Design a protein with these regions (language model features):
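N-terminal leader/targeting and assembly helices and adjacent pre-domain segments
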Residues: 1-197
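Acidic, glycine-rich two-metal-ion catalytic cores of nucleic acid-processing enzymes
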Residues: 197-198, 202-278
């Protein structure tokens, strides 16, 4: 593994641990809220469930009763809104963590790639070009550039109203599925953990996408700097051979093009943002 790839992966693992803590806490809070909500129905549930078991109600009638009790009214609306906003808050924290780390990943990969370009250049070419001096950057430099021109590092953002709406819909679906599966009150509360898991999975995916973009963006910046000094640079597409990699990206593994040309799939690099500079 390329040293900078290894370092980037280590940083990603640290970030993923922080994200896991964020959603673990959110899941714990949601579970407590849900259990308190369903607890108020426990006596009535036991009575009506016994009647259902005795044949007083059909399964469909019992499900309708449960939905009227659990999934409608102001108390449920308030709980669902509260839980959805708590999950969106977690997503905002996750986005902030990602935005905090990506400048470091850009700087790390830019500086290492600059070092590799200079190290691998033959003495003859160095004599022809003359002094070779890359501008090494740190994460603070990258952040300052981002403030002046956001396209350099488009930040991860959470569209709050849209995110809350999505979570409310998923929470409603989780409750409905639990009722249709005849879940107990305890299991119904546990259903909402699946929604927390969906948000956690999305955050991990966003982190990996952002890190890959930052990694390749940092390298591309080093190539551009080398080109300005008269160094011919060729970039090489390396694809990870796992299920997270698109088939079209895996097919490009090993393809080489001049650094300022697009690959055969039209991308300048993996995770390329056409509107950005990196």
């Amino acid at each position: 593994m390329y040293p900078s790839d290894k370092w980037t992966e280590q940083e990603l693992q640290k970030l993923e641990k922080r994200l896991a803590d964020v959603y673990k806490q959110a899941g714990k809070e949601l579970d407590g809220k849900a259990r308190n909500y369903f607890k108020q129905f426990s006596r009535r549930y036991a009575k009506e469930y016994a009647a259902y078991q005795a044949g007083k109600y059909t399964k469909k009638e019992f499900e309708a009763w449960l939905m009227n009790q659990y999934g409608r009214g102001q108390r449920w609306e308030a709980l669902r809104e509260d839980m959805a906003r708590r999950l969106t808050e977690s997503n905002e924290i996750a986005a902030a963590y990602i935005n905090e780390k990506t400048p470091f990943v850009i700087a790390l990969n830019h500086n290492f790639e600059a070092y590799m370009i200079k190290s691998l250049m033959p003495d003859r070419q160095i004599k022809e070009i003359g002094d070779i001096a890359f501008n090494l950057v740190d994460e603070h430099t990258v952040k300052r550039l981002t403030v002046r021109k956001q396209k350099i590092l488009p930040p991860r953002r959470v569209l709050k109203s849209k995110d809350v709406h999505w979570n409310k819909k998923k929470l409603q679906n989780a409750l409905l599925q639990g009722i249709l599966q005849s879940d107990s009150i305890g299991k119904l509360a546990g259903r909402f953990q699946d929604v927390t898991g969906m948000n956690h999975t999305a955050a991990i995916r966003n982190a990996r996408t952002a890190f890959t973009g930052a990694q390749n963006g940092g390298r591309q910046a080093a190539y551009e700097e080398a080109y300005q000094m008269g160094i011919d640079v060729v970039k090489h597409w390396t694809a990870t051979k796992d299920l997270r990699t698109r088939d079209s990206h895996r097919a490009l593994d090993g393809e080489e093009v001049p650094f300022n040309m697009a690959y055969s799939n039209g991308l300048m690099r993996p995770k390329w943002n056409p509107g950005g500079s990196l």
